[in-house]
């Protein structure tokens, strides 16, 4: 699948696909150490820092 980048909105970190707006459901950004992880259902996709 495509890569996602993290974006902050309303004091919360969220993942959004490139060239598209942030989505509220299905995708979440979980900060881990120095990197962020994009989680979609049971799949995990790595993304840039938040």
UniProtKB/Swiss-Prot annotation:
GO terms for molecular function: DNA binding. It holds the Pfam family Protamine_P1. It comes from Sus scrofa. This is Sperm protamine P1. One of its GO terms (biological process) is sperm DNA condensation. GO terms for cellular component: nucleosome; nucleus. It comes from the Eukaryota. The keyword DNA-binding applies. InterPro entries: Protamine_P1 (IPR000221). The keyword Hydrolase does not apply. Testis. Protamines substitute for histones in the chromatin of sperm during the haploid phase of spermatogenesis. They compact sperm DNA into a highly condensed, stable and inactive complex. Keywords: Chromosome, Developmental protein, Differentiation, Disulfide bond, DNA condensation, DNA-binding, Nucleosome core, Nucleus, Spermatogenesis. Cross-linked by interchain disulfide bonds around the DNA-helix. Disulfide bonds join 7-15, 39-47. It is found in: Nucleus; Chromosome. Belongs to the protamine P1 family.
